[in-house]
């Protein structure tokens, strides 16, 4: 199978084939997931919670993100690697640019930034430098304290209108992909149709161009014993982790996941 590139993802959006994305933090899982057909591996700052045991993603450093990106690169067999810029990277445009370069040098093919239209400047600068960017809208975990917790975003019309505007503004700034987290399914569908770039959803319904889950969540692993509403345990009925990951890929591709029960109403 040829390596997945940004052009591949754009082609999948145009053809209507769904994009399967999973978080990944090490070489062994990168090898397993890429061999199972996962299109995109997300080296997420969620590692702060599922690997390090923090209650948010805020303590994660960009150097830790680079370390895990390098680990994933060594095991990857053709998936596109997207890496989160850490919370500490957002205090200035100069810092964002420098940290993005560090992640690309570590093996990322694209970096992910959380936030709204205010990200237009760093996204435009990164695009000029040849660094593809995935913009992350909706529930952005790095802003959990501003939101007052992990809550669905975009239910109020003013919020929904702002998210639509932000998506279009960030695409115009040069974002190559968009991730929508915990927004009403109807709103996610509207945004997916409004932009030309691939849109990946998590807790955003089935109408986005693809889906992403935290690897540990979809394998039924949790520090708290509770899973978010948008998660399905793909280990159920499977004999191995590779089989569970392959089942996830199939479910995303045939649109049997997510079901209505995994999404949110407006």
Swiss-Prot record:
Pfam families: Pantoate_transf. Keywords: Cytoplasm, Magnesium, Metal-binding, Pantothenate biosynthesis, Transferase. Coiled coil: none annotated. Mg(2+) binds at residues 45, 84, 114. CDD domains: KPHMT-like. The keyword Magnesium applies. GO terms for molecular function: 3-methyl-2-oxobutanoate hydroxymethyltransferase activity; magnesium ion binding. Its cofactor is Mg(2+). It is found in: Cytoplasm. The active site is at 181 (proton acceptor). Pathway: Cofactor biosynthesis; (R)-pantothenate biosynthesis; (R)-pantoate from 3-methyl-2-oxobutanoate: step 1/2. 3-methyl-2-oxobutanoate binds at residues 45-46, 84, 112. HAMAP family: PanB. Homodecamer; pentamer of dimers. Belongs to the PanB family. Catalyzes the reversible reaction in which hydroxymethyl group from 5,10-methylenetetrahydrofolate is transferred onto alpha-ketoisovalerate to form ketopantoate. This is 3-methyl-2-oxobutanoate hydroxymethyltransferase 2. It comes from Pseudomonas aeruginosa (strain UCBPP-PA14). The lineage of its organism: Bacteria, Pseudomonadati, Pseudomonadota, Gammaproteobacteria, Pseudomonadales. The gene is panB2.
